[in-house]
Amino acid sequence: MAKHLFTSESVSEGHPDKIADQISDAVLDAILEQDPKARVACETYVKTGMVLVGGEITTSAWVDIEEITRNTVREIGYVHSDMGFDANSCAVLSAIGKQSPDINQGVDRADPLEQGAGDQGLMFGYATNETDVLMPAPVTYAHRLVQRQAEVRKNGTLPWLRPDAKSQVTFQYDDGKIVGIDAVVLSTQHAEDIDQKSLQEAVMEEIIKPTLPTEWLNASTKFFINPTGRFVIGGPMGDCGLTGRKIIVDTYGGMARHGGGAFSGKDPSKVDRSAAYAARYVAKNIVAAGLADRCEIQVSYAIGVAEPTSIMVETFGTEKVPSEQLTLLVREFFDLRPYGLIQMLDLLHPIYKETAAYGHFGREHFPWEKTDKAALLREAAGLK
């Protein structure tokens, strides 16, 4: 492969779409805490002065949607009308119904192992050995930039920062290996009283330099910090936000394919979410086992049917054992039926709100990031 550039982006927890994702997953977590078998499909819309929470929820739990919403917005940092959005005064509207019984009859079964998929669909999982967390570097460092923005905003290092921010990182590759960072974009909402020069200097020193590895930066690396020159109006005042609109930020930054289904607000019976997590788990264990340098898994389902309709393993020519053997190993060591993967990854717990900002993958404490099958795979493949 010749020299090429690859770019990925991320957005902060204060981005309007991410506010929506976090509210949806906060509602999901609150319900799962009381009722692990609940069926939840929670969608959120945010705009200046208002939040609308809707969807289909079937549960024995009772949760205070308004309180959950306000607490989530407050934790993000929208606590004053000067920011264009205020957790204490925004309107919170609710429009929630129940899951269709037509769907439910295909999911719930007398034998849990025969639990059907909550919908048809295709999901992808991916892993690569180019970073320590077995994720693509561009999206990994894009996430870390906006995580650092939130950190220095909340700890008072840069008190004039506001919650809304975006990052973008362009990496240089030569024959598939990283050789440097070509460009960095960071746009952050800020208070009215900070001048552009001071902002750019502070962002460079407190956010960019502590986050990006120095060996990948050079004299030709380009930096674009608030390139429009002003970013005072942000958050839901600047743009409306919707659950599920940042699916590439949530996954692999465009370096792997995507089945199209969003994650946030969905309980684990929805394979859009749970099977995408399982596919990441499979791909990561294959790479961690040294069976391939890069691995992409596709899995697909039919609504109401337990067994996947297909499983595909793609290793882009980096496999250390035959591709056919990899597919057999996946089928042997990973139960990708809905009930099986829920049990395998222990998904019926309130763990989802934290996933809703800074990426669902590449953070080691999530159960789908375990590499506990790597040694088994390596042994079964006959590698020493």
Swiss-Prot record:
Its EC number is 2.5.1.6. This is S-adenosylmethionine synthase. Residues 99-109 are annotated as: Flexible loop. It comes from Klebsiella pneumoniae (strain 342). CDD domains: S-AdoMet_synt. It is found in: Cytoplasm. Pathway: Amino-acid biosynthesis; S-adenosyl-L-methionine biosynthesis; S-adenosyl-L-methionine from L-methionine: step 1/1. GO terms for biological process: one-carbon metabolic process; S-adenosylmethionine biosynthetic process. ATP binds at residues 15, 164-166, 230-231, 239, 245-246, 262, 266. Keywords: ATP-binding, Cytoplasm, Magnesium, Metal-binding, Nucleotide-binding, One-carbon metabolism, Potassium, Transferase. Coiled coil: none annotated. InterPro entries: ADOMET_SYNTHASE_CS (IPR022631), S-AdoMet_synt_C (IPR022630), S-AdoMet_synt_central (IPR022629), S-AdoMet_synt_N (IPR022628), S-AdoMet_synthetase (IPR002133), S-AdoMet_synthetase_sfam (IPR022636).
